[in-house]
A protein has these predicted regions:
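Short, acidic loop-to-helix structural element flanking the phosphoryl-transfer center
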Residues: 1-25, 36, 62
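Asp-based, Mg2+/Mn2+-dependent phosphohydrolase catalytic module
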Residues: 16, 30-32, 36-138
C-alpha cells in the first residue's frame, strides 16, 4: 500500500510550479526503492529521490539532512526543508536549512490529536504546496 499512496490534491501542481525555479528532492526515512515507486505511481516531479538510508541514519539525525544537502551539492543554508511534521523542520533548521511548514490536518485519524500551530521560527507557513509556490513568487 505504501508504494501506491495518493498524493494530496495540491501536491503535483504545487511541486510542478516550484520545480520551475528550484531543485526538488524527497528526503524521507523510507528506503530509496519505496520512494522511487511512490514518486512514479503518484507522478511526483522530483529532480532527485533522497532518503535518510543514504546517510545510514534516520531523521532527525543531523547526518540525514547534511548528507542530502551534500549529495545535491548545496550548502545547508541553500536548502529548504518542506514538511507537515514540525519535528522534522526543527531538526533540519538546526543544521542550517530554511523551513516551510505545510500542515496536513487530515493526515491522521480524527481521534489523533496533533498540534498544528505553526512555529514562529519557520520561514514559510503555507496552507498547501500551491500556496507555498505563490508565497515564493511562482
Amino acid at each position: 500500500a505504501w508504494h501506491r499512496l495518493t498524493p494530496w490534491p495540491d501536491t503535483v501542481r504545487g511541486l510542478t510550479r516550484l520545480r520551475t525555479r528550484y531543485v526538488l528532492a524527497s528526503l524521507s526515512n523510507g528506503n530509496v526503492a519505496l520512494l522511487v515507486n511512490m514518486a512514479k505511481n503518484a507522478g511526483l516531479p522530483w529532480d532527485a529521490v533522497l532518503s535518510a538510508e543514504l546517510a545510514r541514519v534516520y531523521k532527525p539525525d543531523p547526518k540525514a539532512y547534511l548528507t542530502a544537502a551534500d549529495l545535491l551539492g548545496l550548502a545547508p543554508e541553500q536548502v529548504m526543508m518542506v514538511a507537515a511534521h514540525k519535528g522534522d523542520l526543527r531538526a533540519s533548521s538546526m543544521v542550517g536549512f530554511r523551513t516551510a511548514y505545510v500542515p496536513r490536518p487530515t493526515e491522521f485519524a480524527p481521534d489523533v490529536e496533533r498540534d498544528l500551530t505553526p512555529d514562529p521560527d519557520f520561514d514559510v507557513v503555507a496552507t498547501d504546496f500551491e500556496d507555498m509556490a505563490a508565497q515564493l513568487g511562482l
